[in-house]
Each structure stands twice: as structure tokens, then as C-alpha cells.
């Protein structure tokens, strides 16, 4: 077992997103999902006509495949056959982007293309680390908290 996956299984690898999920490759994107008890995992998406392509399992239980035709914003899911023989279509737990409801597909995304706008906040944190102050965690499921009159969900910007 690799050191990183050992830390992942122990709950202490805080950078698993750098390995698992969909990541740019020299040609296309490489997809990885941890499913140690799965009998079989396939990758299906816009880039292969939703025809599941067999993924390859390593000794850590990580299934991987590089899809040469995958591009940013392509939708995809993992087709997982569990130890019980049942097959389910699953979203990527490490996806950087997802469909808007009611869709549940994961979407290919390249974080290097995102324009971050948090420079002022990062400077403030460098000068005054937030870990030295109080912590407040408020959890809310935005989709069930407030909606438009027609029942559709508000965007993050509308809720802000």
C-alpha cells in the first residue's frame, strides 16, 4: 500500500483530491476512484457515448483509467459492481464540478483554468491566521432552505 493511501484510509491525507477524481493527463483526463470492495468499475460519460470503459484496479483498491477524448465540462459517472453483484451508477466523490439539479452527473473540470479572486482574504489570513480566532460552523442544505416560487433552487449568488 502506498503511503498516501495508507494515510487516506486512516483519515489523515488531506490532499486526496490531488490524486483521486478526474485530472488532466498528457492526452485527455485520468480518472481515479477508491472502491476496494468492488468487483468491477467502469467509466461512462459524454466522451465515450456513456458506454462503460473498464477501469484498472491497483493494490490499494484504486480504479483508474485515462480517457483520451474527455474534455472540460464532459459529464461522467462510475459504473460500480459491488461485492454483492449489484451494479450502480455513482457520481465521483472527488469531482471538482457537478451537474445542476436535478442532474447528478459529475463534470470534468480543470482547476488550473479557474480564476481565483481570494487574494485579499489570503493576505489577511497570512497576517492573522484564522486558527487563532473563534470557529463557527453553520451547516445548511441550501437546496431545501429556500427556493424560487416555482420550486427551483436559488443559486449560491442569489442566496448570498
Can you name each region flagged by the protein language model?
Residues 1-30, 50, 54-139, 144-151, ...:
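The feature marks proteins involved in alpha-glucan
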Residues 34-41, 48-50, 71:
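Short proline/glycine-enriched turn/loop motifs at strand-loop junctions of beta-rich domains
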Residues 41-43, 76:
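Short beta-strand elements bearing conserved aromatic residues within extracellular beta-rich modules
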Amino acid at each position: 500500500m502506498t503511503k498516501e493511501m495508507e494515510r487516506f484510509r486512516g483519515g489523515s491525507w488531506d490532499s486526496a483530491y490531488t490524486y483521486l477524481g478526474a485530472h488532466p493527463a498528457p492526452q485527455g483526463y485520468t480518472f481515479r476512484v477508491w472502491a476496494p470492495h468492488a468487483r468491477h468499475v467502469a467509466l461512462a460519460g459524454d466522451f465515450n457515448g456513456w458506454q462503460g470503459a473498464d477501469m484498472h484496479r491497483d493494490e490499494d483498491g484504486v480504479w483508474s483509467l485515462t480517457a483520451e477524448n474527455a474534455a472540460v465540462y464532459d459529464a461522467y459517472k462510475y459504473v460500480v459492481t459491488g461485492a454483492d453483484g449489484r451494479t450502480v451508477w455513482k457520481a465521483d466523490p472527488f469531482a471538482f464540478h457537478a451537474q445542476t439539479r436535478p442532474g447528478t452527473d459529475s463534470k470534468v473540470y480543470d482547476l488550473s483554468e479557474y480564476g481565483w479572486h481570494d487574494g485579499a482574504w489570503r493576505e489577511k489570513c497570512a497576517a492573522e491566521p484564522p486558527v487563532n480566532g473563534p470557529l463557527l460552523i453553520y451547516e445548511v442544505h441550501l437546496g431545501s432552505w429556500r427556493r424560487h416560487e416555482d420550486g427551483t433552487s436559488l443559486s449560491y449568488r442569489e442566496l448570498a
